[in-house]
A protein has these predicted regions:
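Catalytic centers of hydrolytic enzymes
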Residues: 1-124
Length: 124
């Protein structure tokens, strides 16, 4: 389950029936503005992904391994858990909710998978 990622800031679908490399369709930015495949966007990710872990940048996005370092514009000395902890301390309480910015299609494939994975993860 370490190899499951989702993206905030965009609205997209994951079509499990499409071939490798064509499964993701980005519908728009989360605010409804147009997403352009030709534009460059700043993306935040954890150090594992940012350093090429899981090959999402190399195999997935086609970025050569030797280019990854030059694309990093900021690197924190602290991990994301630290920043989550500080934000929770600042707010006192948090009420997390799903972004609901993506979904699997078609539903007839996704729903059985969700049921199966919940049983594996939570024993239900």
């Amino acid at each position: 389950y370490y190899n499951f990622d989702s993206a905030a800031g965009i609205i997209y679908t994951v079509d499990v029936t499409k071939p490798k490399g064509e499964k993701i369709t980005i519908i728009s930015m989360a605010d409804g503005t147009h997403f352009s495949e030709d534009a460059w966007y700043k993306v935040s990710m954890n150090s594992y992904r940012g350093n090429g872990g899981g090959e999402l940048l190399t195999r997935g996005a086609g970025i050569p391994k030797d280019e990854i370092e030059s694309r990093i514009i900021y690197r924190s000395e602290l991990d994301m858990r630290y920043y989550f902890m500080k934000e929770i301390e600042r707010l006192g309480h948090v009420y997390p909710k799903a972004n609901n910015n993506w979904h699997f299609i078609p539903d007839e494939y996704a729903i059985p998978g969700i049921i199966r994975d919940k049983a594996i993860l939570f024993g239900k």
